[in-house]
UniProtKB/Swiss-Prot annotation:
Keywords: Disulfide bond, Fusion of virus membrane with host cell membrane, Fusion of virus membrane with host membrane, Glycoprotein, Host cell membrane, Host membrane, Host-virus interaction, Membrane, Signal, Viral attachment to host cell, Viral envelope protein, Viral penetration into host cytoplasm, Virion, Virus entry into host cell. Specific enzymatic cleavages in vivo yield mature proteins. Envelope glycoproteins are synthesized as an inactive precursor that is N-glycosylated and processed likely by host cell furin or by a furin-like protease in the Golgi to yield the mature SU and TM proteins. It holds the Pfam family TLV_coat. GO terms for biological process: fusion of virus membrane with host plasma membrane; symbiont entry into host cell; virion attachment to host cell. Disulfide bonds join C115-C132, C124-C137. The mature envelope protein (Env) consists of a trimer of SU-TM heterodimers attached by noncovalent interactions or by a labile interchain disulfide bond. It comes from Feline leukemia virus (isolate CFE-16). Residues 35-273 are extracellular. This is Envelope glycoprotein. The keyword Disulfide bond applies.
Length: 273
Protein backbone atom coordinates (compact mmCIF):
# COMPACT_ATOMS: atom_id res chain seq x y z
CA UNK A 1 0.00 0.00 0.00
CA UNK A 2 1.45 3.30 -1.01
CA UNK A 3 1.87 5.96 1.57
CA UNK A 4 0.10 9.27 1.27
CA UNK A 5 1.60 11.95 -0.90
CA UNK A 6 3.17 14.63 1.21
CA UNK A 7 3.64 18.23 0.18
CA UNK A 8 7.19 19.57 -0.25
CA UNK A 9 8.74 20.99 2.91
CA UNK A 10 8.27 24.69 3.38
CA UNK A 11 12.03 25.29 3.12
CA UNK A 12 11.94 24.12 -0.51
CA UNK A 13 9.37 26.80 -1.25
CA UNK A 14 11.52 29.34 0.54
CA UNK A 15 14.53 28.31 -1.57
CA UNK A 16 12.46 28.67 -4.74
CA UNK A 17 11.43 32.19 -3.82
CA UNK A 18 15.00 33.06 -2.88
CA UNK A 19 16.17 31.81 -6.27
CA UNK A 20 13.55 33.87 -8.08
CA UNK A 21 14.54 36.98 -6.17
CA UNK A 22 18.24 36.36 -6.88
CA UNK A 23 17.61 35.91 -10.60
CA UNK A 24 15.54 39.08 -10.62
CA UNK A 25 18.32 41.06 -8.98
CA UNK A 26 20.92 39.72 -11.44
CA UNK A 27 18.70 40.56 -14.39
CA UNK A 28 18.23 44.05 -13.06
CA UNK A 29 21.98 44.45 -12.66
CA UNK A 30 22.55 43.15 -16.17
CA UNK A 31 20.03 45.58 -17.61
CA UNK A 32 21.70 48.38 -15.70
CA UNK A 33 25.13 47.54 -17.13
CA UNK A 34 23.80 47.02 -20.65
CA UNK A 35 21.87 50.31 -20.53
CA UNK A 36 24.11 52.86 -18.83
CA UNK A 37 22.90 56.35 -18.12
CA UNK A 38 22.83 58.46 -21.30
CA UNK A 39 24.42 61.28 -19.31
CA UNK A 40 27.44 59.25 -18.16
CA UNK A 41 30.69 60.78 -19.45
CA UNK A 42 33.46 58.46 -20.67
CA UNK A 43 36.90 58.70 -22.25
CA UNK A 44 36.05 57.54 -25.78
CA UNK A 45 38.61 56.65 -28.46
CA UNK A 46 37.72 56.11 -32.12
CA UNK A 47 40.24 54.21 -34.24
CA UNK A 48 40.52 53.70 -37.99
CA UNK A 49 42.63 50.63 -38.79
CA UNK A 50 44.23 49.37 -41.98
CA UNK A 51 42.87 45.81 -42.09
CA UNK A 52 45.68 44.54 -44.32
CA UNK A 53 48.60 45.71 -42.18
CA UNK A 54 46.85 46.19 -38.83
CA UNK A 55 48.29 49.69 -38.47
CA UNK A 56 46.27 52.63 -37.18
CA UNK A 57 45.34 55.34 -39.64
CA UNK A 58 43.73 57.50 -36.97
CA UNK A 59 43.10 57.41 -33.23
CA UNK A 60 41.01 60.23 -31.79
CA UNK A 61 40.14 60.46 -28.08
CA UNK A 62 37.59 62.72 -26.43
CA UNK A 63 35.40 63.02 -23.36
CA UNK A 64 31.69 62.57 -23.97
CA UNK A 65 28.62 60.42 -23.62
CA UNK A 66 27.78 57.36 -25.70
CA UNK A 67 25.20 59.41 -27.59
CA UNK A 68 27.17 62.52 -28.50
CA UNK A 69 30.86 61.53 -28.84
CA UNK A 70 30.97 61.09 -32.62
CA UNK A 71 33.77 63.34 -33.87
CA UNK A 72 34.80 63.95 -37.45
CA UNK A 73 37.80 61.71 -38.19
CA UNK A 74 40.64 62.66 -40.53
CA UNK A 75 43.09 60.26 -42.17
CA UNK A 76 45.07 59.82 -45.36
CA UNK A 77 44.19 57.33 -48.07
CA UNK A 78 47.76 56.02 -48.10
CA UNK A 79 47.44 55.15 -44.41
CA UNK A 80 44.85 52.48 -45.26
CA UNK A 81 46.75 51.32 -48.35
CA UNK A 82 50.38 50.96 -47.37
CA UNK A 83 52.28 49.05 -50.04
CA UNK A 84 49.30 47.04 -51.24
CA UNK A 85 48.62 49.46 -54.10
CA UNK A 86 52.12 49.67 -55.51
CA UNK A 87 51.53 48.61 -59.12
CA UNK A 88 53.83 46.24 -60.92
CA UNK A 89 56.17 47.20 -63.74
CA UNK A 90 53.63 45.85 -66.23
CA UNK A 91 51.52 48.93 -65.53
CA UNK A 92 53.92 51.83 -66.18
CA UNK A 93 51.32 54.62 -65.89
CA UNK A 94 48.78 53.33 -63.37
CA UNK A 95 47.75 56.70 -61.96
CA UNK A 96 47.61 55.40 -58.40
CA UNK A 97 49.82 54.14 -55.58
CA UNK A 98 51.61 55.52 -52.55
CA UNK A 99 55.26 54.74 -53.27
CA UNK A 100 56.02 57.79 -55.45
CA UNK A 101 55.08 61.49 -55.26
CA UNK A 102 53.63 61.53 -58.78
CA UNK A 103 51.46 58.47 -58.13
CA UNK A 104 50.20 60.02 -54.92
CA UNK A 105 49.36 63.19 -56.84
CA UNK A 106 47.55 61.28 -59.60
CA UNK A 107 45.69 59.21 -57.02
CA UNK A 108 44.55 62.41 -55.34
CA UNK A 109 42.62 63.31 -58.49
CA UNK A 110 40.94 59.90 -58.84
CA UNK A 111 37.37 59.17 -57.76
CA UNK A 112 36.62 56.46 -55.19
CA UNK A 113 33.65 54.63 -53.69
CA UNK A 114 33.13 52.86 -50.35
CA UNK A 115 31.13 49.71 -49.54
CA UNK A 116 30.19 48.39 -46.08
CA UNK A 117 31.28 44.96 -44.92
CA UNK A 118 29.14 44.99 -41.77
CA UNK A 119 25.96 44.64 -43.85
CA UNK A 120 26.79 41.01 -44.80
CA UNK A 121 25.15 41.30 -48.22
CA UNK A 122 26.02 38.18 -50.20
CA UNK A 123 25.79 39.86 -53.59
CA UNK A 124 28.44 42.38 -52.51
CA UNK A 125 31.09 39.72 -51.88
CA UNK A 126 33.74 39.71 -49.20
CA UNK A 127 37.06 41.39 -48.41
CA UNK A 128 38.58 40.13 -51.67
CA UNK A 129 35.99 42.29 -53.48
CA UNK A 130 36.20 45.21 -51.10
CA UNK A 131 32.55 44.37 -50.35
CA UNK A 132 31.86 45.97 -53.75
CA UNK A 133 31.38 42.93 -55.99
CA UNK A 134 28.50 44.53 -57.93
CA UNK A 135 27.32 48.06 -58.56
CA UNK A 136 24.82 49.22 -55.99
CA UNK A 137 26.85 48.04 -53.00
CA UNK A 138 28.54 51.44 -52.60
CA UNK A 139 27.07 53.75 -49.95
CA UNK A 140 29.44 56.72 -49.98
CA UNK A 141 32.50 58.11 -51.74
CA UNK A 142 33.55 60.77 -54.25
CA UNK A 143 32.32 59.87 -57.75
CA UNK A 144 30.20 61.53 -60.40
CA UNK A 145 27.10 59.53 -59.37
CA UNK A 146 27.51 60.56 -55.70
CA UNK A 147 26.74 57.28 -53.89
CA UNK A 148 24.65 57.65 -50.75
CA UNK A 149 22.69 55.55 -48.30
CA UNK A 150 19.92 55.98 -45.73
CA UNK A 151 21.18 53.14 -43.52
CA UNK A 152 24.99 53.03 -43.52
CA UNK A 153 26.93 54.36 -40.54
CA UNK A 154 29.55 56.64 -42.11
CA UNK A 155 30.30 58.92 -45.02
CA UNK A 156 33.79 59.30 -46.50
CA UNK A 157 34.74 62.32 -48.60
CA UNK A 158 37.92 63.94 -49.88
CA UNK A 159 39.62 66.54 -47.74
CA UNK A 160 41.56 69.57 -48.87
CA UNK A 161 45.36 69.62 -48.79
CA UNK A 162 46.90 73.03 -48.32
CA UNK A 163 49.84 74.04 -50.46
CA UNK A 164 50.78 74.49 -54.08
CA UNK A 165 51.34 71.67 -56.54
CA UNK A 166 53.27 73.35 -59.32
CA UNK A 167 56.31 75.53 -58.84
CA UNK A 168 57.71 78.14 -61.17
CA UNK A 169 59.42 76.59 -64.17
CA UNK A 170 56.92 73.75 -64.42
CA UNK A 171 58.43 71.58 -61.72
CA UNK A 172 56.09 69.65 -59.47
CA UNK A 173 56.16 70.34 -55.78
CA UNK A 174 53.87 70.34 -52.79
CA UNK A 175 52.59 68.00 -50.08
CA UNK A 176 52.78 64.85 -52.23
CA UNK A 177 56.53 64.95 -51.60
CA UNK A 178 57.85 63.49 -48.37
CA UNK A 179 59.88 66.18 -46.62
CA UNK A 180 62.08 63.51 -45.02
CA UNK A 181 63.25 62.55 -48.53
CA UNK A 182 62.75 65.82 -50.43
CA UNK A 183 63.64 68.39 -47.80
CA UNK A 184 64.34 71.09 -50.41
CA UNK A 185 60.98 70.66 -52.17
CA UNK A 186 58.57 73.51 -51.60
CA UNK A 187 55.55 72.50 -49.54
CA UNK A 188 56.70 68.92 -48.89
CA UNK A 189 54.76 67.23 -46.06
CA UNK A 190 55.40 64.52 -43.51
CA UNK A 191 55.15 61.19 -45.30
CA UNK A 192 54.03 62.88 -48.52
CA UNK A 193 50.43 62.73 -47.36
CA UNK A 194 48.33 64.51 -49.96
CA UNK A 195 45.27 62.24 -50.09
CA UNK A 196 43.29 63.43 -47.04
CA UNK A 197 39.92 61.84 -46.30
CA UNK A 198 37.15 62.98 -43.98
CA UNK A 199 34.99 60.41 -42.19
CA UNK A 200 31.75 61.48 -40.53
CA UNK A 201 29.09 59.48 -38.71
CA UNK A 202 25.53 59.42 -40.05
CA UNK A 203 22.41 59.47 -37.91
CA UNK A 204 22.24 55.67 -38.20
CA UNK A 205 25.87 55.49 -37.12
CA UNK A 206 25.07 57.48 -34.01
CA UNK A 207 22.24 55.12 -33.14
CA UNK A 208 23.91 51.76 -33.76
CA UNK A 209 25.87 49.66 -31.29
CA UNK A 210 29.66 49.91 -31.55
CA UNK A 211 30.44 46.93 -29.36
CA UNK A 212 32.92 45.70 -31.98
CA UNK A 213 34.78 47.04 -35.04
CA UNK A 214 32.92 47.49 -38.32
CA UNK A 215 34.61 47.14 -41.70
CA UNK A 216 34.43 48.83 -45.09
CA UNK A 217 36.11 48.51 -48.44
CA UNK A 218 37.31 51.45 -50.53
CA UNK A 219 37.97 51.16 -54.27
CA UNK A 220 39.32 53.64 -56.78
CA UNK A 221 37.12 54.30 -59.80
CA UNK A 222 39.35 54.01 -62.85
CA UNK A 223 39.66 52.24 -66.16
CA UNK A 224 40.68 48.64 -65.71
CA UNK A 225 40.99 47.09 -62.28
CA UNK A 226 39.71 49.11 -59.31
CA UNK A 227 42.27 48.61 -56.50
CA UNK A 228 40.94 47.78 -53.02
CA UNK A 229 41.69 49.12 -49.55
CA UNK A 230 40.13 47.67 -46.39
CA UNK A 231 39.64 49.55 -43.13
CA UNK A 232 37.67 49.27 -39.92
CA UNK A 233 36.21 51.76 -37.47
CA UNK A 234 36.07 50.87 -33.78
CA UNK A 235 35.21 52.55 -30.50
CA UNK A 236 36.84 52.03 -27.12
CA UNK A 237 35.02 53.27 -24.02
CA UNK A 238 36.90 53.85 -20.77
CA UNK A 239 35.38 54.97 -17.51
CA UNK A 240 36.81 58.11 -15.99
CA UNK A 241 38.43 57.58 -12.62
CA UNK A 242 37.16 60.29 -10.27
CA UNK A 243 39.88 62.34 -8.61
CA UNK A 244 40.61 61.41 -5.03
CA UNK A 245 39.60 63.98 -2.46
CA UNK A 246 42.48 65.81 -0.87
CA UNK A 247 42.20 66.41 2.88
CA UNK A 248 44.38 67.43 5.79
CA UNK A 249 47.36 65.31 6.67
CA UNK A 250 46.49 62.46 9.03
CA UNK A 251 47.26 62.99 12.71
CA UNK A 252 50.28 61.00 13.76
CA UNK A 253 50.04 59.09 17.05
CA UNK A 254 51.85 60.13 20.24
CA UNK A 255 52.13 63.72 19.19
CA UNK A 256 53.07 66.21 21.90
CA UNK A 257 52.21 69.89 21.83
CA UNK A 258 55.01 72.05 20.48
CA UNK A 259 57.46 73.17 23.13
CA UNK A 260 57.64 76.86 23.85
CA UNK A 261 60.98 78.46 23.10
CA UNK A 262 62.43 80.21 26.13
CA UNK A 263 64.44 83.30 25.38
CA UNK A 264 67.71 83.54 27.32
CA UNK A 265 67.68 86.16 30.05
CA UNK A 266 70.39 88.78 30.02
CA UNK A 267 71.87 90.01 33.28
CA UNK A 268 71.91 93.77 33.14
CA UNK A 269 74.69 95.35 35.20
CA UNK A 270 73.80 98.89 36.19
CA UNK A 271 76.36 101.55 35.44
CA UNK A 272 77.39 103.91 38.25
CA UNK A 273 75.76 107.27 37.92
Amino acid sequence: MEGPTHPKPSKDKTFSWDLIILVGVLLRLDVGMANPSPHQVYNITWTITNLVTGTKANATSMLGTLTDAFPTLYFDLCDIIGNTWNPSGQEPFPGYGCDQPMRRWQQRNTAFYVCPGHANRKQCGGPQDGFCAVWGCETTGETYWKPTSSWDYITVKKGVTQGIYQCSGGGWCGPCYDKAVHSSTTGASEGGRCNPLILQFTQKGRQTSWDGPKSWGLRLYRSGYDPIALFSVSRQVMTITPPQAMGPDPVLPDQKPPSRTVSPQLNVIPHPS
